[in-house]
């Protein structure tokens, strides 16, 4: 009898927890942070929140490979936040460029074929891409900055000629 009471009591507690846990209204996908972000980017240029592939088609940015980032302004030090955002944007640019070059290199017909007959790039190719991109990243420059209410947005770019130079050093066809 005691075991039955314990089971019923235990099941009741579990059921109550499930009911309480599920009683919250479903989230709409719009949180305070999303609202705050929309407010912070209200009136910002297209490159701040727009698709970078579309931004790259603007005449102003057509000759560069782009990266962007943001940083919260701390202690009203916009310069520090700009430097932080620029460093993040360069890191994003490097990661995107490495990924693009690896994908392009995989598509090159001159690459090695693995045991299953698929083209693949070797670890040395990946390492070489990383080294070349890191070496040329110093040539990237800040193209634009937008200072919002509480954060700084930065757009950086690397000239296509430098990207072509990296492609050439990898033995790839120019795009």
Curated annotation (Swiss-Prot):
Signal peptide: 1-21
Keyword Transmembrane helix recorded: no
Membrane topology summary: Lipid-anchor
Listed GO CC annotations: cell outer membrane
Signal keyword on record: yes
Pfam families tied to this protein: LPP20
Function field: Could play a role in the pathogenesis of H.pylori by serving as an inflammatory mediator.
Protein name: LPP20 lipoprotein
Annotated source species: Helicobacter pylori (strain J99 / ATCC 700824) (Campylobacter pylori J99)
Lineage: Bacteria, Pseudomonadati, Campylobacterota, Epsilonproteobacteria, Campylobacterales
């Amino acid at each position: 009898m005691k075991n039955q009471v314990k089971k019923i009591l235990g099941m009741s507690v579990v059921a109550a927890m499930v009911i309480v846990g599920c009683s919250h209204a479903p989230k709409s996908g719009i949180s305070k942070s999303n609202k705050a972000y929309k407010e912070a980017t209200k009136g910002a240029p297209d490159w701040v929140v727009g698709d970078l592939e579309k931004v790259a088609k603007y005449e102003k940015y057509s000759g560069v490979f782009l990266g962007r980032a943001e940083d919260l302004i701390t202690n009203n030090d916009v310069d520090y936040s700009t430097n932080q955002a620029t460093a993040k944007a360069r890191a994003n640019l490097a990661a995107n460029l490495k990924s693009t070059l690896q994908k392009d290199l995989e598509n090159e017909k001159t690459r090695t074929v693995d045991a299953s007959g698929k083209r693949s790039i070797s670890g040395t190719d990946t390492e070489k891409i990383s080294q070349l991109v890191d070496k040329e990243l110093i040539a990237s420059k800040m193209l634009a900055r937008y200072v919002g209410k509480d954060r700084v947005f930065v757009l950086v770019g690397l000239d296509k000629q430098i990207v072509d130079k990296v492609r050439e050093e990898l033995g790839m066809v120019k795009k």
